[in-house]
Amino acid sequence: MASRLVAGLQVLALAGTATAVLTWDEAYAKANTALARITQQDKVSLVSGIGWDKGPCVGNTAPVSAINYPQLCLQDGPTGVRFGTGVTAFTPGIQAASTWDVELMRQRGQFQAEEQKGCGVHVMLTPVAGALGKIPEGGRNWEGFGVDPYLAGIAMEVTIEGQQSVGVQATAKHYLLNEQELNRNTMSSNVDDRTLHELYLWPFADAVRANVASVMCSYNKINGSWACENEHAMQKLLKDELGFKGYVMSDWNAQHTTTGSANAGMDMTMPGSDFNGGNVLWGPQLNTAVNNNQVARTRLDDMARRVLAAWYLTEQDKGYPPINIRANVQGNHKENVRAVARDGIVLLKNDAGALPFKAPRRLAIVGSASVANPRGINSCVDRGCNEGALGMGWGSGTTNYPYFSAPADAIRARAQQDGATVTLSASDSTADVANTVRDADAAIVFLTSNSGEGYLLVDGSYGDRLNLDPLHNGNQLVQAVAQANKNTIVVVHSVGPLVLESILSTPGVTAVVWAGLPGQESGNALVDVLYGSVSPSGKLPYTIARATADYGTAIVPGDDNFPEGLFVDYRHFDRANIQPRFEFGYGLSYTNFTYSNIKVASTVRSGPATGPVVSGGRADLWETVATVTATVTNSGGVAGAEVAQLYVSYPKGGSVPETPPRQLRGFNKLKLAPGASGTATFNIRRRDLSYWHVGQQNWVVPAGAFGLEVGASSRDLRLKESITVV
């Protein structure tokens, strides 16, 4: 992480917008001084939203004039400034994860924060570590960074570093175990202690390590207790075990009681009332509870101190732009959108060099998903429809498009440079599609699968996907096109995995391009890959199965007991010896890469973590205890980038409980010219070799032989080594 941090700081310094931030100790010293100058009512105002739709932002608190504390503005979110009119529509988190590029992730976070700050937003309601994505149909999986906690954790860390370097408070959400939209307001997520630590809490530890200012508690119950009044989750795990020094805010109307939430460790309520303006649980009610000794004054002080400390940590007391959600703040940020959209494209299939295009004379484009929404790119509230090309899912994590580069428009513009003709059928009907594609050198079919937040109904779905098939009869459309054109390219824009067996078994389908969720630069990014301006370098942040049942998880109608435990996605496939269609970490290139010369150095010793608790947990968990290096060579004829991946297997037998056969514990993206070689370096932290010992309530490195495998995906592992821990 140290080398990534140095490189990231260099990027931020060059941008000229990063600001120095205080340490938590310095921020707390300032907060204590301020706390001594304000009244009990002021403290209540600091931690209470003023009510839904009572201010310019989705969340607002009252100002405290005695310390020059402003009206705090809290705003979504994951793809940009929600409701903004002069903002960038960034790529969602799942697309950033598909790049496996930590510097693009960091820059994405920085650029997002620059826009939030330019609009006067103090607290940006992002990034997302939950849903982690254990259920492939889960409605909000696309907002986060994929199903692996290590990948999600690194993405959370560098994103928050980028965001808070600009002086905006980041929010890690949704804490915790909010894995589906169905019944999210009533269900209980019941999970065992080890699974909780090793999967779902893991990326939040990375967020705390990055000094995240706030954490948002979720709608669901955790082991029978509402997340926003669950003392074990908020106090014991987050604040005590992980050393979180910021504040816990509720998701919007996720609070259920006045005293229960306060005494359990929640620090701020949002938005302060229900969506009808009633049911105020803090504000005057909190003041009364404190006066009646139902909530201790020291607890109120702790809430207010945490909120103030986060404000000082990001140095928002030193002048801040006024709130103006309609400010034009786009700058050059579309460059990051295009880069993430492009480098997150995963090439799944490419028979006989169908791609990149070699100046075809006639192209055919098919599908409603190839063009912009004919009703207008922002015509659907919170992107709550599936009309036209897909750039993001739907819900509160969306933003308005300033423009949208539609795939058909971008392909047509590029084809004209070659003097080519393009025929378009912006329909999903199979009726006359053969006439459109029959004479083309290549036919490009566009498919989608969409999901989002449960307050909107889209294509029969309240958030979670109904199945893992393409929408709008996509399989039949591909079959009809490929029957008439034997060079059919399928482009998929999707929030998550699809079952592609029908498409892959269709004769005439020569290539499948997984374009994900590209934001506003959709078409431009796709053209970069289709025409070979760059070689595709994205890798899957989840598994694509041969059948939906292969995942072993599904949306549940009541409480979810998490019976799969640790074994989700590739961990489950490996344990059950199920052959996926495309494994986690998979992705083709226009060039080839070879791996060689693996080396290992280790100082690790077995036993529990013993260091003091710092931000992120015990300090020694974050120490590098082993280093693995490998040489990666571009053995092909064009430039490309390879994501070298490190997987660790734990010792078998003895006192070690059952562990997934292999787990991601490092990745390195190398950009290489033809014939060039680079060194992939993986710094393994003590944490990465530990398991959660339920009896000791601690992270423990077991004795024995750890397997180390380096390769191009979770099932394409080219190099093997081991370390023996005593």
Swiss-Prot record:
SMART domains: Fn3_like. Induction: The transcript levels are constant during infection. Residues 1-20 form the signal peptide. Glycans are attached at residues 223, 592. Pathway: Glycan metabolism; cellulose degradation. Optimum temperature is 50 degrees Celsius. Its EC number is 3.2.1.21. Keywords: Carbohydrate metabolism, Cellulose degradation, Glycoprotein, Glycosidase, Hydrolase, Polysaccharide degradation, Secreted, Signal. InterPro entries: Cellulose_deg_GH3, Fn3-like, Glyco_hydro_3_C, Glyco_hydro_3_C_sf, Glyco_hydro_3_N, Glyco_hydro_3_N_sf, Glycoside_hydrolase_SF, Ig-like_fold. It is found in: Secreted. One of its GO terms (molecular function) is beta-glucosidase activity. SUPFAM superfamilies: (Trans)glycosidases, Beta-D-glucan exohydrolase, C-terminal domain. The keyword Heme does not apply. GO terms for cellular component: extracellular region. It comes from the Eukaryota. Pfam families: Fn3-like, Glyco_hydro_3, Glyco_hydro_3_C. One of its GO terms (biological process) is cellulose catabolic process. The keyword Cytoplasm does not apply. It catalyses: Hydrolysis of terminal, non-reducing beta-D-glucosyl residues with release of beta-D-glucose. Optimum pH is 5.5. The biological conversion of cellulose to glucose generally requires three types of hydrolytic enzymes: (1) Endoglucanases which cut internal beta-1,4-glucosidic bonds; (2) Exocellobiohydrolases that cut the disaccharide cellobiose from the non-reducing end of the cellulose polymer chain; (3) Beta-1,4-glucosidases which hydrolyze the cellobiose and other short cello-oligosaccharides to glucose. Beta-glucosidases are one of a number of cellulolytic enzymes involved in the degradation of cellulosic biomass. Catalyzes the last step releasing glucose from the inhibitory cellobiose. Has a broad substrate specificity but preferentially hydrolyzes highly polymerized 1,3- and 1,4-beta-glucans. Belongs to the glycosyl hydrolase 3 family. This is Beta-glucosidase cel3A. It comes from Pyricularia oryzae (strain 70-15 / ATCC MYA-4617 / FGSC 8958) (Rice blast fungus). The lineage of its organism: Eukaryota, Fungi, Dikarya, Ascomycota, Pezizomycotina. The gene is cel3A.
